[in-house]
């Protein structure tokens, strides 16, 4: 065990960005590229095994930098654990030292001990049957997953092998707790111009930069589950358990169940189901007349953040056949607007939908106390205000990788209840 960690620590080198282009870590076999139908930032190439004559399988994963065209955000080499994997790691290390163009993080799979900084990825791992691999989280108060909270509460019980450590804030994580966890990988959400990860970079632990939220296509983001399935995937003959019990989760609730042993296979089948349902809903909405106009979010300080026209939310509104005042915008992230800009362009919006955290839904009186300008919105005066409490409703946990759920929600807001009842938003 000690030897394995020493080998891994020597080879796992951090990377913040590098030039784009073909891999420098490959061994010349060309590999087999996993076809991505929607994800534009993610490339996966499988090497070895059936793809070449030599022994030793591994996968190469590259993530394009969403903020700097033509460069890579990160590159990973996923190598199975075991003796054959050790040989593959050594061989690849020699090739990289012989002139690699880009430093690469080596990750031994399956990852069985990880620190996960975001609640949507925690939820996804549970859904893939890999929740047992979560051993540390950040921003625990904002995670709406029952089993995570239960396992975090048992962290003081040293006899609990399934406990989850509270690693503090994702913006300033508790480094000592992370070191004590000895995670095999740390999954974080990257930001533009973040300047790196500070002390985390010095731990020589692979940092998985989950840039899926920067995909412009909702299905593109969901397709990243194929990558996460490979990271946490298990041998088809290995069972998935926590303290002797298999776990699954629906809407944040954990229960005993029989789970597929391979997170990778589960990810492939789950994405296929999500894609089918999403495209079905999109086609049905496209047959309807143009729907109501929808404005999202509310003022934060002096800024009103709204989805860019090419963001996942912007595309969801388009696919719902709703009208969106920033549909012509070309940004894939959020747009920081002044309240005056929003009111000038969106005063006549039909529906106002936003999220809040904790407490009762905000009344119109409370909203006006927050910002008197809200009264200029037609949706406000007509009472077409829809809210979702993310402290009790697993909105982020469920919708991030299940865009079909949010698409249905927006279709109902834009076209009425013919598509069923709202699951998240309440009037």
Feature names for model-found ranges:
Residues 18-427:
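N-terminal ligand-binding lobe of clamshell/alpha-beta domains
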Residues 8-16:
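Bacterial N-terminal signal peptides
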Residues 6-8, 249:
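General helical structural elements
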Residues 1-5:
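Positively charged n-region of N-terminal signal peptides that target proteins for export
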């Amino acid at each position: 065990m000690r030897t394995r960690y020493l080998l891994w620590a020597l080879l796992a080198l951090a990377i913040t960005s590098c030039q784009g282009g073909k891999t420098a870590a490959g061994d010349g076999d060309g590999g087999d590229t996993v076809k991505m139908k929607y994800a534009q930032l993610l490339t996966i190439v499988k090497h070895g095994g059936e793809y070449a004559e030599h022994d030793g399988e591994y996968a190469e994963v590259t993530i394009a930098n969403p903020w700097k065209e033509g460069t890579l955000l990160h590159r990973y080499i996923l190598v199975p654990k075991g003796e054959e994997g050790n040989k593959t790691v050594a061989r690849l290390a020699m090739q990289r030292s012989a002139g690699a163009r880009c430093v690469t993080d080596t990750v031994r799979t399956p990852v069985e001990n990880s620190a996960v900084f975001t609640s949507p990825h925690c939820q996804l791992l549970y859904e893939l049957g890999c929740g047992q691999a979560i051993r540390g989280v950040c921003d625990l108060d904002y995670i709406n997953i029952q089993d995570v909270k239960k396992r975090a509460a048992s962290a003081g019980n040293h006899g609990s092998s399934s406990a989850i450590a509270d690693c503090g804030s994702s913006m300033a994580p508790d480094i000592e707790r992370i070191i004590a966890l000895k995670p095999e990988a740390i999954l974080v959400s990257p930001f533009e111009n973040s300047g790196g990860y500070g002390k985390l970079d010095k731990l020589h632990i692979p940092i998985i930069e989950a840039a899926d939220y920067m995909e412009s296509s909702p299905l593109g983001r969901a397709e990243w589950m194929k990558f996460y399935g490979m990271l946490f995937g298990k041998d088809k003959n290995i069972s998935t358990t926590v303290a002797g019990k298999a776990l699954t989760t629906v809407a944040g609730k954990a229960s005993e169940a029989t789970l597929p042993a391979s997170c990778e296979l589960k990810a492939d089948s789950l994405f296929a189901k999500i894609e089918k349902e999403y495209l079905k809903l999109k086609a049905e909405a496209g047959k309807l007349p143009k729907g109501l106009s929808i404005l999202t979010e509310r003022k934060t300080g002096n800024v009103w953040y709204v989805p860019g026209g090419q963001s996942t939310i912007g595309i969801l509104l388009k696919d719902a056949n709703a009208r969106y005042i920033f549909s012509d915008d070309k940004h894939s992230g959020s747009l920081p607007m002044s309240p005056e800009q929003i009111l000038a362009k969106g005063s006549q919006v039909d529906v106002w939908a936003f999220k809040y955290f904790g407490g009762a839904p905000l009344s119109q009186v409370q909203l006006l106390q927050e910002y008197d300008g809200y009264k200029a919105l037609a949706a406000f005066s007509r009472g077409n205000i829809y809210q979702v409490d993310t402290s009790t409703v697993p909105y982020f946990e469920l919708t991030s990788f299940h865009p079909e759920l949010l698409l249905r929600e927006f279709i109902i807001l834009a076209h009425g209840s013919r598509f069923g009842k709202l699951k998240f938003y309440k009037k």
